[in-house]
Amino acid sequence: MAFTLGGRARRLVSATSVHQNGCLHKLQQIGSDRFQLGEAKAIRLLPRRTNMVQELGIREEFMDLNRETETSYDFLDEMRHRFLKFKRQKYLPEIEKFKALAIAQSPKVMVIGCADSRVCPSYVLGFQPGEAFTIRNVANLVTPVQNGPTETNSALEFAVTTLQVENIIVMGHSNCGGIAALMSHQNHQGQHSSLVERWVMNGKAAKLRTQLASSHLSFDEQCRNCEKESIKDSVMNLITYSWIRDRVKRGEVKIHGCYYNLSDCSLEKWRLSSDKTNYGFYISDREIWS
């Protein structure tokens, strides 16, 4: 038996179909729009994606470099370990001493040392924090007052006139690269001389004396002699500063020269003496500590 719909039913079905078809069409349109928007966005993102890929490539290379560095020597981790060890083993057990040092310093010694990493004055001579005011430069040179201001003589002025140190030590050492540069440098100063060459030429007088006295020796032996002569010259140059010379005359400041031999861990020492009659100064009292 055939089943037929009434007029009202046909109208409802027809309306429903139209509604469904309209919804379907709208959904299709929305999907198409979204696809077009997505496509446009993707096109806009292409350069950004390319940059990201390039950046990732750079990051990968950087990470590879980091991995190589970390496997060889992780500097920051090592420094962190050493600092915390210092705090745990030295700072905390003597915290009152370090709190006092945080307020002020009153060192009795001024050291002019070489910048060489193998020769730390505090390590070699056993100075504790607050005991020695230290300045280091290439070849531990002290220039005379007429040469003008340097970081070394400015530190000297502060140590002597403000901190009122009682001893000044010029500390040199064997196998000094600065003195080797001085000895190997030609006696004329070229226009393109490096900063190191120009600085070490402040020791030229010691070089010339060494060449005159030991020209028959090997280059290395001449360097050893020049290292000591340079220390003596720096000691004498200290007297060109009136605020040092006057204190030495009054016995308030003593000046010493030290030569540390890296090969056998010996220390050769001199002292600056003065002639009371005419206020002349000379190097004396040579000692060797070994």
Swiss-Prot record:
Subcellular location: Mitochondrion
Transit peptide boundaries: 1-20
Transmembrane portions of the chain: none
Database matches in Gene3D superfamilies: Carbonic anhydrase (3.40.1050.10)
A GO CC annotation given for this chain: mitochondrion
Residues annotated with S-nitrosocysteine modification: 226
Modified residues (Phosphoserine): 122
EC annotation from Swiss-Prot or TrEMBL: 4.2.1.1
Tissue: Strongly expressed in aerial tissues including leaves, stems, flowers and siliques, and, to a lower extent, in roots. Accumulates in guard cells.
Coarse class of the protein's main subcellular location: mitochondrion
Keywords per UniProt: Lyase, Mitochondrion, Phosphoprotein, S-nitrosylation, Transit peptide, Zinc
BP GO annotations: carbon utilization
Swiss-Prot/TrEMBL catalytic activity: hydrogencarbonate + H(+) = CO2 + H2O
One GO MF term attached to the UniProt entry: zinc ion binding
Domain of life: Eukaryota
InterPro entries: Beta_CA_cladeB, Carbonic_anhydrase, Carbonic_anhydrase_CS, Carbonic_anhydrase_sf
Similarity remark: Belongs to the beta-class carbonic anhydrase family.
Summary of the function given for this chain in its UniProt record: Reversible hydration of carbon dioxide.
Protein name: Beta carbonic anhydrase 6, mitochondrial
Organism, scientific name: Arabidopsis thaliana
